[in-house]
Amino acid sequence: MLNFFAAAPRGYEYALSLELAEFGAAEIKESVAGVYFSAPLNLAYRITLWSRLASRIILVIYKGPCENPEQLYNAAYCIDWQTHFSNKSSFSIDFHGVGGFIKNSQFGALKIKDAVVDRFRDDGCPRPDVARVDADFKIDAHYRRGQITLGINFSGPALHQRGYRSTTGEAPLKENLAANMLVRSGWQQSPKDLLDPFCGSGTILIEAAMMACDIAPALQRRRFGFEHWLRHQEADWQELLAEAKARASIGTKRCEIKFYGSDIDSRLVALAKRNAQNAGVAELIELSVSNALNVTPPVEQGYLITNPPYGERLGNVTSLLQLYYQLGDKLKAEFGGWQVAVLNSDIELLSALKLKADKQMKMYNGALECAFNLYTLHANSTRRLDPSQVLSQGGEVSEVATAFSNRIKKNHKQLSKWAQREGIDSYRLYDADIPEYNVAVDIYLDHVVIQEYSAPKSIPEAVTKRRLTDVLLVLPQAIGVDPDKIILKTRERQKGTNQYQKLDATKLELVTTEYGAKFKLNLKDYLDTGLFLDHRLTRKLVGEKSKGRDVLNLFAYTGSASVHAALGGAKSVTTVDMSNTYLNWAQDNFELNGLKGKQYQFIQGDCLQWIDDCDQQYDLIFIDPPTFSNSKRMEDSFDVQRDHVKLLSALVKLLRPGGEILFSNNKRKFKMDSEALSALGLSITNLDKQTLPLDYKRNPHIHNTWLIQHA
């Protein structure tokens, strides 16, 4: 008997141990990411040829303590390598594990390599060549908790590489993962007609067809690790191959099970057809290009086993939630009597199916932890709900979710008409009106941006996730927006430079109109979009006060107030911001509005330092500083509450007689030091009510605005 380790992804251990037991292996012991077993050589060949779940088969030749480099070297040196491979074969070391004296796998591999070549040399043989890639003979080493296990890669390249796949789709499913899904779903034990409505390149269907046809998964492979092992018995191997070919021929002819697959991507369907042809099961699989939501049951009862798209894989989260909701609706309505199994990494997407799982299992798709849920659909599972009637975990219609839907509809009816009258196409639709749904919803033309506020620590994460799922499910139906045009962001309390950090690089750009001005929006790349909607009336006021005046815009962001000033007839407009990115954006906004000329200046710099250095004066100054900033470009931190008097006293020096300062900020509990400003000879007028747009009336403390003049 020989000792082996069958490596497999985490979560496969139990199913793999059962598979090995069916083969007749002995001394089976589950471990982390694999199973140890014993078997004679002929059975090891059979397992390598027929295992549908294992990733690799390792022949274990040494296992012992290893506390230092010398013990590691001696463990490898004591093995009579000449009896395992020829010095004419190249070799390599696959070393796994770190800890203790093993700081990195390269160190461990190098020690073993030295021991192997030294052993060949000391036995009077020329040393074999070391190959970095594509070695003839591979030594496998595992170090864990002071123990070293040395073995021979018996199977060779990863066993999930069956040999039928030509190329892959964007998110291919490994073959042994598909096989594990078929095993754990119960399909392998009692096979029935099988449907995969998200078939991609066909892996689930092909693996199932190979099972049904008794086709050995490794039958088409061209390379195995044991081929350069000196104890390999070629005659025994060829006998097993001949047996497998005969079984495949008989099984393919006898198979009566049908397999159905579809995908919305015609390119992937064509690829699935080629893969099925390569695997020898093309005649058994019916493939078509179709939206999963249009698929109908091909037979009265069967299995639907699938790996739909999910967040880490493909697609927009809002679109995916809608897809899962509608898929669950369809399954309940049309697939009564079917067994359904779904693999997904996002529990919220699975919950959107609104199906009660018979069983939930954990599987890994590479390093990604996934849930594998099994469902039995009963013939009367046909209840259909409007997405506004989102189900709570208890299974009852959530009253608060319905209230959210009604509020969205009410706000949209009122505000969409108002926005049209105002001459704007971007506005705030909802701002945490209902405390349980702590989000802001903004309309930007035909797109929607949802900003999720950070929930209090007292609310469980599962609850906040479920509520966000409600929001994403309700919105498309409530206001008639395409789910693909909904963008989700998470907004936390802004601190320092965090305010304008980049989030993405997908460049979803639109042009919005505001009182005749045009502005470029970027809905995805940053937390903010390039236009603060709550300052709409403040910008309009800047435009109304700018005619014939020299205007200065500080902390200008994307220059939207500068555009209004220029369109309002300003004599000159100076735009200052620390960020080159936003200054370039401001210049784009000027170009959008046909504004060109030397009278429009764009200056990159620390605004606070620039104020101190400036020797010019202006008639109108608009300043909207951050609540707090400690940018690496600024010498000191800035706090608007602490520093506003100092800031305004410096700013007054830049103000001509008769000039005005429009000062605004977003600190909710900001208190203007009116006494200190009066002492500076300034009069102040609060403009909060005048500059608060209708769409922000529900949040009157969104910003502060003040008109400051010489007394």
Curated annotation (Swiss-Prot):
This is Ribosomal RNA large subunit methyltransferase K/L. It catalyses: guanosine(2445) in 23S rRNA + S-adenosyl-L-methionine = N(2)-methylguanosine(2445) in 23S rRNA + S-adenosyl-L-homocysteine + H(+); guanosine(2069) in 23S rRNA + S-adenosyl-L-methionine = N(2)-methylguanosine(2069) in 23S rRNA + S-adenosyl-L-homocysteine + H(+). Its EC number is 2.1.1.173, 2.1.1.264. Its main location: cytoplasm. Coiled coil: none annotated. The gene is rlmL. It is an enzyme of class 2 (transferase). Belongs to the methyltransferase superfamily. RlmKL family.
